[in-house]
Amino acid sequence: TDTEFEAAGGGVR
């Protein structure tokens, strides 16, 4: 899912 953590550039792709 999209979270602010992903927005910060730290998400599992």
From Swiss-Prot:
Compartment list: Secreted
GO biological process terms held by the UniProt record: adaptive immune response; blood coagulation; innate immune response
Keywords: Adaptive immunity, Blood coagulation, Coiled coil, Disulfide bond, Hemostasis, Immunity, Innate immunity, Secreted
A GO cellular component annotation in the UniProt record: extracellular region
Modification after translation: Conversion of fibrinogen to fibrin is triggered by thrombin, which cleaves fibrinopeptides A and B from alpha and beta chains, and thus exposes the N-terminal polymerization sites responsible for the formation of the soft clot. The soft clot is converted into the hard clot by factor XIIIA which catalyzes the epsilon-(gamma-glutamyl)lysine cross-linking between gamma chains (stronger) and between alpha chains (weaker) of different monomers. Forms F13A-mediated cross-links between a glutamine and the epsilon-amino group of a lysine residue, forming fibronectin-fibrinogen heteropolymers.
Transmembrane residue ranges: none
Role description: Cleaved by the protease thrombin to yield monomers which, together with fibrinogen beta (FGB) and fibrinogen gamma (FGG), polymerize to form an insoluble fibrin matrix. Fibrin has a major function in hemostasis as one of the primary components of blood clots. In addition, functions during the early stages of wound repair to stabilize the lesion and guide cell migration during re-epithelialization. Was originally thought to be essential for platelet aggregation, based on in vitro studies using anticoagulated blood.
Free-text note on domains in this protein's UniProt record: A long coiled coil structure formed by 3 polypeptide chains connects the central nodule to the C-terminal domains (distal nodules). The long C-terminal ends of the alpha chains fold back, contributing a fourth strand to the coiled coil structure.
Quaternary structure, from the entry: Heterohexamer; disulfide linked. Contains 2 sets of 3 non-identical chains (alpha, beta and gamma). The 2 heterotrimers are in head to head conformation with the N-termini in a small central domain.
Protein name: Fibrinogen alpha chain
Organism: Cavia porcellus (Guinea pig)
Gene: FGA
